[in-house]
Amino acid sequence: VSINRLYADTIQQSPEFQIIEELLYEECENIIDLSKKLFLSPSKTQRNLKKIESVLLKTGITLQYRPLRLEGNESVIRHMYYRYFIEKSDRLDSLYRDLKEFQIKAITELVNQFIQVNKLEDNYISRKRLGYNMYISLWRIKNGHYYPTLELDSDLMLPERQILDA
């Protein structure tokens, strides 16, 4: 077992890290739902949420309790999740929670096309970073958290629609 795998497994067992991940998916309406999902007592869940909340507040991220979700600067939230998944996982495919094969293929193809259209360096690190960021962005968008239009100014291009539909 590699040290990276040991570290990733340790993080995955941490209640605080499990809570942070659950907050991305926004599937728990309240503390009781979250505690049941993670097999923690409601009081331990609440203590962990308070601990997480105090750290998040320093970055301008707020924890909403009903429903449980993170709000604040969208770029900071997405970057936090990127850093979280980098620490948690040593393999890209272990990231994709509850995704079907065709969805994983779609993300992979979008990454491929994005690299090609923008003439980016095509290596494992670039693919991993883009894959993680697309996965996180899709979940955030699914839950109604959009990137502010004014912050979307970039020279990067998206692949043509017909290429994506193929």
Protein language model features and the residues they cover:
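A cross-family "folded-core" feature that marks the main globular domain of proteins
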Residues: 1-166
